Amino acid sequence: MKLPRQSIINRFPDLHIHQTIDEIRELLTNGFDDSQKTIFLCGKDKSDKKSLRYKFSTFLSQEKGITLTYPEDLFEDLLEGQGKNSLLSLETQLADSVDLIVLIPESPGSFAELGAFSMDKALAEKMLVMRMGEFKSGKSFINHGPVRLVRTHGGESPRII
């Protein structure tokens, strides 16, 4: 499937996406067995074809041995009619059971996920945070708060792109 060239995400050319997919593939296979791997993919609405998350889901869904999981699918299934569970506790349970959390902070919900997950060392160690070009540097709460926590928890190999 060929992706549309027109995109609001101008700072992530398709070549860069392919390179990052290769990095994700390496993270999943380096030091692991060859069993099925599950990626929790967070970002802008997965149906928004202009989002970076949509592009990554398109590429990763074609990879053998990878299952993608989305926060909104969890919400639809588990929260229908339930008032006692918080979104954060349910999402944390799911994120805790996956091999890799790929988080693209490109929407209010994904900003909240980044903040929440960065506070949990076990989850932060599983995170690959992909900041869009214009947000990679500069003074911001995201860079000086959650991103620093992920770097701290990531040890020798923090996963911040």
Task: Indicate where each model-derived feature is located.
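Conserved catalytic or regulatory cores that recognize and/or transform ribose-phosphate-containing ligands
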Residues: 1-161
